[in-house]
Amino acid sequence: MFLAQEIIRKKRNGLALCSEEIQFFVQGITTNSVSEGQIAALGMAVYFNDMNMDERIALTTAMRDSGTVLNWQSLELNGPVIDKHSTGGVGDVISLMLGPMAAACGGYVPMISGRGLGHTGGTLDKFDAIPGYQTEPSSELFRKVVKEVGVAIIGQTGDLVPADKRFYSIRDNTATVESISLITASILSKKLACNLDALAMDVKVGSGAFMPTYEASEELARSIAAVANGAGTKTTALLTDMNQVLASCAGNAVEVKEAIDFLTGAYRNPRLYEVTMGLCAEMLLLGGLASNEADARAKLNRVLDNGRAAELFGKMVSGLGGPADFVENYSKYLPQSQIIRPVFADMQGYAYSMDTRELGLAVVTLGGGRRKPGDALDYSVGLTQVCALGDKVDSSTPIAVIHAQSEAAFAEAELAVKKAIHIGETAPEKTPEIYAYIRASDL
């Protein structure tokens, strides 16, 4: 028998907690036998004194086991259960292509995603732009679509990781969100509750990333790779660039359109292609669906070129309540804003740098993102044709096209976009889309 206050005292004094102490405390979070004040105190103690890898693994697995852990055995799936998670960015539409691509190569992708908050977009918000699509289906329907289609992208159900929900809301109110140990446990407990065979983790770096510096992003990526592998899930973390918008657009309906254009081959943004292929190839390798990276990329290109990935996206949409002809006729279903107009830079030159976070906040200002949880969204608004770093811009080449519902909203977004995209006389040095892979062998 443990006492919550003694566990807090031990961590306050900089000592390591044993797994039984951590399990006891997490159980208390779930059953409400540990008070809000005690949870806040432990969060602050961890924030200042950190946790070693054994503690992080114990916290992650205890939180994972605080609710339902999905079981796929009864479905007799004939392939690995694989997934990816991103720390969030702007124009990060990867999940919409990656899920069907991995499924078309023989994987099963039960992706539980989140909504956007602050400057980052949420995968679920993009699916909410599709009429009829159920982001909160019954567990029976979720399992049915995973088995029959190979991919289902939905929201977190109430019985998954209840400890994280309570802990996170208290951390948010007590300034302990920015702890690498607690971020690691929060992210991974939700993913590992899906009982995955393998996970590819996309940790963003740069002006649109959650972590402020490359070093902090790398520390988080290493922590996630170490803890996930330590908890028994084959995991690789990729450090990817978020110093500019990832796709050519940012918003909800506009990103769904770009995802379908990518899957059908109508248009593939080269940066988006590189990061999507890097993550998806890693999923195939970890899941045993490819023998090496070249083999994985060849398989992925095949399912893009033969239309199989686009077909599975369509089947997932209709399986979860959306229109059966969505891929073929998406323009009929996606909402469109009142004003669609380009914005031009005040000088000619090259797109030299971007404050990606500010571009994400411009989408929020238009009504396409949330200032606080629960805010209603306008799925039609956003940015399209966003220039890439190094692009030449002048009076006839826009730096972006704004989709707005009013002149006032357009004017506000225009100012924000001009301020966020810096024009220089020369093109900047090219940076890689993927900075590093952190595999189990690198830890």
Curated annotation (Swiss-Prot):
Annotated PROSITE patterns: THYMID_PHOSPHORYLASE (PS00647)
GO cellular component: cytosol
Gene Ontology MF terms: 1,4-alpha-oligoglucan phosphorylase activity; thymidine phosphorylase activity
Record SUPFAM superfamilies: Nucleoside phosphorylase/phosphoribosyltransferase catalytic domain, Nucleoside phosphorylase/phosphoribosyltransferase N-terminal domain, Pyrimidine nucleoside phosphorylase C-terminal domain
Enzyme class (EC, first level): transferase
Alphabetically ordered keywords of this record: Glycosyltransferase, Transferase
Pathway where it operates: Pyrimidine metabolism; dTMP biosynthesis via salvage pathway; dTMP from thymine: step 1/2
Catalysis: reaction(s): thymidine + phosphate = 2-deoxy-alpha-D-ribose 1-phosphate + thymine
One biological process term in Gene Ontology: pyrimidine nucleobase metabolic process
The enzyme's E.C. designation: 2.4.2.4
Job description of the protein: The enzymes which catalyze the reversible phosphorolysis of pyrimidine nucleosides are involved in the degradation of these compounds and in their utilization as carbon and energy sources, or in the rescue of pyrimidine bases for nucleotide synthesis.
Assembly, per entry: Homodimer.
HAMAP family: Thymid_phosp
Family membership: Belongs to the thymidine/pyrimidine-nucleoside phosphorylase family.
Protein name per its UniProtKB record: Thymidine phosphorylase
Name of the gene encoding the protein in the UniProt record: deoA
